[in-house]
Curated annotation (Swiss-Prot):
The modification Pyruvic acid (Ser) is found at residue 61. The keyword Kinase does not apply. The lineage of its organism: Bacteria, Bacillati, Cyanobacteriota, Cyanophyceae, Synechococcales. It catalyses: S-adenosyl-L-methionine + H(+) = S-adenosyl 3-(methylsulfanyl)propylamine + CO2. GO terms for biological process: spermidine biosynthetic process. Binds 1 pyruvoyl group covalently per subunit. This is S-adenosylmethionine decarboxylase proenzyme.
Length: 128
């Protein structure tokens, strides 16, 4: 296994927290630490009239978040490589700190081409 990839949908979150760039920077940093990952860089951007996007570059891969405070919604992506990291822990931090009332988490194992070849019989072609 190369790593784990978590896609997290957060619903009915605290709108003020979703729109607070400094709060999100702190929360993403905490999430990376809780996952056992090494934070290399963190960039965030606030949008007008609302919303924040953040991207944490990890030694093990990345964490990204996009927020829509007006809808109480955040889209989160956590991808970590290696066996020592726990991306689900990062997701739990973000869920709790953003006070999500509901969430949906999808977790995928990322595999090398050799490992995928053992499990995929017919490759799926993307359009275009």
């Amino acid at each position: 296994m190369v790593g784990k990839h978590c896609i997290l949908e957060l619903y009915d979150c605290d709108p003020a927290r979703l729109d607070d760039e400094a709060f999100l920077r702190t929360t993403i940093t905490t999430a990376a630490k809780r996952a056992g990952a090494t934070l290399l860089n963190l960039i965030t951007h606030s949008f007008e009239p609302q919303g924040v996007t953040g991207l944490a570059l990890l030694a093990e891969s990345h964490i990204s978040i996009h927020t829509w405070p007006e809808s109480g919604y955040a889209a989160v992506d956590v991808f970590t490589c290696g066996d020592h990291t726990m991306p689900e822990q990062a997701c739990a931090v973000l869920r709790d700190e953003l006070r999500a009332q509901r969430h949906a988490l999808r977790s995928f194992r990322r595999e090398t081409p050799a490992a995928v070849a053992d499990t995929v019989r017919e490759p799926i072609q993307l359009p275009g």
